[in-house]
């Protein structure tokens, strides 16, 4: 008996863009496990699967203040443009900065005047007639640089980056951190260093590289070198410090940070509509 339904097939198809039969077979092979099904589709050559699987259906905005970054969702971009919605986001991120809330539940309980964040969201939701959701929050205690990016001039920021860093206290420290924030916004780094990549992710990428190389008919004796090359390509794409700098493609982000005497300790990137 299959451990998935027609609705599961539809969901996987929406996430990946793969064909219905391919999705059905991938779910069957993975016993209904979505992550394994996505991996199976990638092995079979659906090259855009990983990126499409990150997408979610949501509108809204990101906001930053102090060491805090939030994502507040709405159902439509019409509401995202609403002045009251944007004002609420400003109040919520201010509450996040002052309360240092570590997660959404803690932030929902934080105060905005005489009410809570959760109550304020519910009240505006009832007034506007659209579901609103506080999707996520991040807070860093150290020295931070924030960057917000708009997809269109008439829309609020949809991409937000928060970078925590250490330097020598020079003005150039902030400039270097800002350049890194722009880099993260543009190239979507997922990890700071290679050591931060979870072992299961590395194992999955290695397995995908090996299986795709075999499917391409590569010589058996050449597989180890090919797999390592593709794995290094993954690190170059996903790891911030190993990415080529957008400002100087001949140097990595790590090289430019070393030259500036700045150390990035952590970062977070939120994008409306993505996981």
UniProtKB/Swiss-Prot annotation:
Function statement: Associates with the EF-Tu.GDP complex and induces the exchange of GDP to GTP. It remains bound to the aminoacyl-tRNA.EF-Tu.GTP complex up to the GTP hydrolysis stage on the ribosome.
Matching HAMAP family: EF_Ts
Primary site of residence: cytoplasm
Protein name: Elongation factor Ts
Gene Ontology, cellular component aspect: cytoplasm
Subcellular location: Cytoplasm
Keywords for the protein's UniProt record, in alphabetical order: Cytoplasm, Elongation factor, Protein biosynthesis
Entries under InterPro entries matching the protein: EF-Ts_dimer_sf, Transl_elong_EFTs/EF1B, Transl_elong_EFTs/EF1B_dimer, Transl_elong_Ts_CS, UBA-like_sf
Family the UniProt entry places it in: Belongs to the EF-Ts family.
């Amino acid at each position: 008996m299959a451990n998935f339904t027609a609705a599961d097939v539809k969901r996987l198809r929406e996430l990946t863009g793969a064909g219905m039969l391919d999705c059905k077979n991938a779910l069957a092979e993975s016993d209904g496990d979505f992550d394994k099904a996505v991996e199976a589709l990638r092995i079979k050559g659906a090259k855009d699967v990983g990126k499409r699987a990150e997408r979610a259906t949501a509108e809204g905005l990101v906001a930053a203040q102090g060491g805090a970054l939030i994502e507040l969702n709405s159902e439509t971009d019409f509401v995202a443009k609403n002045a009251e919605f944007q004002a609420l986001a400003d109040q919520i991120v201010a509450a996040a900065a002052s309360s240092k809330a570590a997660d959404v539940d803690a932030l929902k309980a934080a105060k905005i005047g005489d009410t809570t964040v959760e109550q304020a969201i519910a009240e505006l939701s009832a007034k506007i007639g659209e579901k609103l959701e506080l999707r996520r929050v991040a807070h860093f205690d150290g020295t931070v640089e924030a960057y917000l990016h708009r997809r269109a001039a008439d829309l609020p920021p949809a991409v937000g980056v928060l970078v925590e860093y250490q330097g020598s206290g020079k003005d150039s420290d902030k400039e270097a951190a800002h350049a890194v924030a722009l880099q993260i916004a543009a190239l979507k780094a997922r990890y700071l260093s290679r050591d931060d990549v979870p072992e299961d992710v590395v194992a999955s990428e290695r397995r995908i590289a090996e299986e795709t190389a075999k499917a391409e008919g590569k010589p058996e004796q050449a597989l180890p070198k090919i797999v390592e090359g593709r794995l290094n390509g993954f690190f170059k794409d996903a790891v911030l410090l190993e990415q080529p700098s957008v400002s100087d493609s001949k140097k990595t982000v790590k090289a430019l940070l070393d030259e500036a005497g700045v150390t990035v300790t952590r970062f977070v990137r939120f994008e409306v509509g993505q996981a």
